[in-house]
A protein has these predicted regions:
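Active-site metal-coordination segments of metallo-dependent hydrolases
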Residues: 407-419, 451, 481, 519-526
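Long, K/E/R/D-enriched contiguous segments that form extended
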Residues: 294-331, 337, 363, 374, ...
Length: 599
């Protein structure tokens, strides 16, 4: 039996010493004390002076600079605690440190609540007088955004209550869901009895070439998730209701409106993405009709979605994954290699599998003066190579955006998926160019098509599930798990049409999706980013070297401009349904290419 890479090589774990030497580092408490002192000082110095008719550009610029210095210090302890906690959510000491930093953040933030509120209340004539001054030019985007948010702000006393209670409301329930899922063990039936597996270990078996292995893995997932049904359904209902209350208090019309405002996108643009994607679900059905034929099956069910169409998937050691990714990046620009090599050399990546480690993958960019960290669960599959590229893409974006000040450092969510998805495309293109036989090219292409479906159509199906779940909670009251199962299953099944039947065992699989708990309505950002990158990548293939600098400029902008403004510079109109349809057409072309290769 062939061993997986994680059994034959040591996978990297983080070195977080660039943040703190350890959980007992005196610098942690020292930084929290200093940030708290600076917050109190900031409040004394600036409160009541921002929303004033006589406000000068110089005074506002000084306040913004002090605010950034304070936040740069404040964010560091929480970032360290969050990174540490995600590698072992079962460790009480790590959980306690995470909670300590969150409570510190809340107590510090109570002294800062006034600032954004006062920016929103600067008299219009005063803002008109100072907004175009050279001193404020670097902060103009941030100021304009905060003033747009002002319509949804509460009074300072009310905002303080929400800040103070955040850790005992939704944030606490979201942490509970994370811990429940991280602690869950899945019991897979094998010869000799059941074998216990973590979430990351069981999910990878859905890609196994043996259908019975996939079936048993799926059954184990369903059984494990159903054990959590009561707790996770209660948690989700609580979060749905909390959002309903907050939306009512803040005068948001629809559940998703606050996310659109944060993302600096209009509801009309997001609706266009969602509706165009849903109108192209037929592409998914067409592909799975093809896949059923390739697999030689009479019908497909949910555990056949990711079945490889040829033989065993090769286990790829992490060192080889590194070479594949860096080699692909280097063909685009040596600059990408220069940015990414330190992630490997200085242990900015945590890839090992471990009990208690949360599932999934992410990249954490904290502040412009700190390097990002990449988190993943590396099992050695080809898709894990793509995940490594994806998260390093985020890291590239963070590094290139570090020339911005903190308040414009992070790109909004839809733009944050640009570099990550583009990085995947670079790896895919290189791998495709190295293959010689039609069979190999077909297998790679089918894997990419399925990944694209998961990023575009599945995320839109999830977004629609979220929309319906939030509305159902507001109209029907607390939702039983069966109702949530029904909404999940309906939206997921629509994507496949009559080409694949998900089956009742799949109905509870919403229970392990972290984004719907942690960041409501995040998921449409994936579809936005993937379809955007399909267009950008087509332009790169057409323009070659001329495109590279324009691409770097796009990433270097960070969050300094809204998506529509950033992309207008590349002659892209995000309000155009034709643009999004163009991306869906490119996906359909891949399906047609797969059909041609299959004969």
């Amino acid at each position: 039996m062939t061993q997986s890479p994680r059994e034959t090589e040591t996978l990297p774990v983080w070195d977080l010493s660039d943040l703190y030497a350890g959980a007992d580092d005196p610098g942690l408490d020292r930084d929290m004390r200093e940030a708290a002192r600076l917050a109190r000082q900031f409040e004394v110095k600036y409160k009541g002076t921002i929303a004033a008719a006589g406000l000068s550009a110089a005074h506002l610029r000084a306040a913004l600079a002090d605010y950034e210095d304070l936040l740069t210090l404040q964010y560091k302890p929480g970032a360290y605690a969050g990174l540490l906690y995600s590698t072992d959510t079962t460790d009480p000491a790590r959980g306690a440190l995470l909670q300590k930093t969150r409570e510190f953040d809340s107590s510090t933030a109570t002294h800062l609540v006034f600032f954004d509120l006062e920016i929103g209340r600067i008299p219009p004539q005063t803002y008109e007088r100072i907004k175009d001054s050279p001193e404020l030019a670097p902060y103009r985007h941030y100021l304009d955004h905060e003033r747009r948010m002002a319509a949804h702000n509460l009074d300072e006393a009310e905002e303080k209550i929400l800040v103070e209670t955040a850790n005992s409301r939704g944030r606490a329930f979201a942490r509970l869901a994370t811990e429940v899922n991280s602690r869950t063990r899945f019991h897979m039936e094998e010869e000799g009895g059941a074998v216990e597996k973590t979430q990351s270990e069981i999910l990878v078996l859905l890609y196994d070439p043996d259908r019975d292995t996939r079936r048993r893995a799926a059954a184990a997932i369903t059984e494990g998730l159903r054990r959590n049904t009561h707790v996770c359904t209660f948690v989700y209902n609580t979060l749905l209701h909390e959002k309903e209350v907050l939306d009512r208090l803040r005068s948001y019309r629809a559940p998703e409106d606050s996310r659109h405002l944060d993302n600096e996108l209009s509801g009309e643009v997001v609706d266009a993405v969602s509706e165009v994607c849903a109108a192209n679900y037929g592409t998914v059905a067409a592909y799975y009709h093809l896949k059923r034929r390739l697999l030689g099956l009479d019908e497909l069910t949910h555990y056949d979605r990711y079945a490889p169409i040829t033989g065993d998937e090769t286990d790829i050691p992490f060192g080889q994954a590194r070479d594949i990714v860096l080699g692909s990046f280097g063909e685009f620009s040596p600059r990408l290699v220069d940015i990414c090599e330190p992630f490997f050399e200085r242990r900015w990546i945590d890839a090992a599998l471990a009990d208690g480690k949360r599932g999934g993958a992410y990249c954490a960019g904290v502040t412009p003066d700190l390097h990002p960290y990449v988190f993943l669960n590396y099992t050695g599959s080809p898709r894990d190579v793509m995940t490594l590229a994806h998260e390093l893409g985020h890291g590239i974006h963070d590094v290139l955006a570090s020339g911005n000040h903190l308040l414009d450092y992070h790109p909004v969510l839809p733009m944050a998926e640009t570099a990550s998805t583009f990085a995947e495309m670079l790896v895919f293109d290189r791998l495709r160019g190295e293959l010689e036989s039609d069979g190999e090219r077909l297998a790679l292409l089918c894997g990419k098509i399925e990944d694209t479906f998961a990023t575009v159509f599945r995320q839109i199906a999830m977004y629609r599930f979220e929309q319906q779940a939030h509305r159902a909670r507001r109209e029907e009251g607390e939702l039983p798990s069966e109702r949530l199962d029904e909404l999940w299953q309906r939206n997921m099944q629509e994507m496949f049409g009559d080409a694949l039947t998900l089956g009742d065992d799949h109905a509870c699989w919403w229970l392990y999706i972290p984004h719907i708990v942690d960041v409501p309505f995040y998921v449409y950002a994936y579809a936005f980013g993937e379809l955007l990158v399909l267009a950008l990548y087509a332009r790169y293939r057409s323009e070659g070297e001329a495109f590279v600098d324009r691409y770097f400029e796009l990433l270097a902008a960070g969050g300094s401009r809204a998506p529509a403004e950033l992309l207008a510079g590349l002659e892209i109109d995000v309000a155009s349904r034709d643009f999004w349809q163009g991306g869906c057409d490119l996906i359909r072309q891949r399906v047609d290419e797969a059909a041609a290769l299959a004969g």
